[in-house]
Regions:
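Two-component/phosphorelay signaling modules centered on CheY-like receiver
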Residues: 4, 13-37
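Active-site residues of response regulator receiver
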Residues: 9-10, 61, 91
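Helix N-cap/capping motif at the beta->alpha junctions
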Residues: 34-47, 69
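Active-site beta3 strand of CheY-like receiver
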Residues: 49-59
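Receiver (REC) domain active-site loop signature in two-component systems and cognate sites
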Residues: 64-65
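Alpha4 helix (beta4-alpha4-beta5 surface) of REC/receiver domains from two-component response regulators
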Residues: 71, 94-110
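C-terminal output helix
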Residues: 115-125, 129
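CheY-like receiver
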Residues: 130-167
């Protein structure tokens, strides 16, 4: 089974480098992949889907040339071929309308303002990937235990089987 992927998208190479560095503690369990535009990210996702590579999380900047992060994440939701993939939006320049669209149209799971703190990013990502892992790998989640968020796991155990709002 290929490792699930965390796809990071930002048009600024230094921001991508910081994201990859901050997410490095997860690299034993997840492949961290980057793209510098929504167009590149779309091609990466198409390739992963064709190869059967699971995509756990998309971390996208909002303000990018061409297609914004909200527009891209809306396209991902509308595609329908990544139903379990979690979505995290990063931005320092979102308007109130952007935030509403991110929630209502793109079904973004979380939002983090730039600049972020590494521990904040890892906490949010940990919560999102825990929900993903418990949903997609219910019988083999133990292999991910070192990086799963314990609070989310306890909440899930208390809720019992069935659909959950852990996003």
């Amino acid at each position: 089974m290929p490792k699930p992927v965390i796809l990071c998208i930002d048009d600024q190479r230094e921001v991508l480098a910081a994201l990859i560095k901050d997410l490095d503690p997860l690299a034993e369990w997840f492949d961290i992949v980057d793209a510098e535009s929504a167009e590149d990210a779309g091609a990466v996702l198409d390739d992963m889907i064709d190869r059967g590579v699971p995509v756990a999380l998309i971390v996208s900047d909002h303000v990018m040339p061409g297609v914004t992060g909200v527009q891209f994440l809306t396209q991902i939701r509308e595609r329908g071929d990544l139903p379990h993939t979690r979505k995290l939006l990063l931005t320092g320049l979102a308007t109130h309308d952007d935030t509403i669209r991110a929630i209502n149209e793109a079904a973004v799971d979380r939002y983090i303002a730039k600049p972020w703190h590494a521990d904040q990013l890892l906490d949010v990502v940990g919560r999102l990937i825990t929900g993903y892992v418990l949903e997609v790998y219910p019988d083999s989640y133990q292999q991910f235990l070192p990086v799963l968020n314990r609070d989310v796991m306890v909440e899930r155990m208390q809720q019992g089987p069935g659909p959950h709002g852990d996003r």
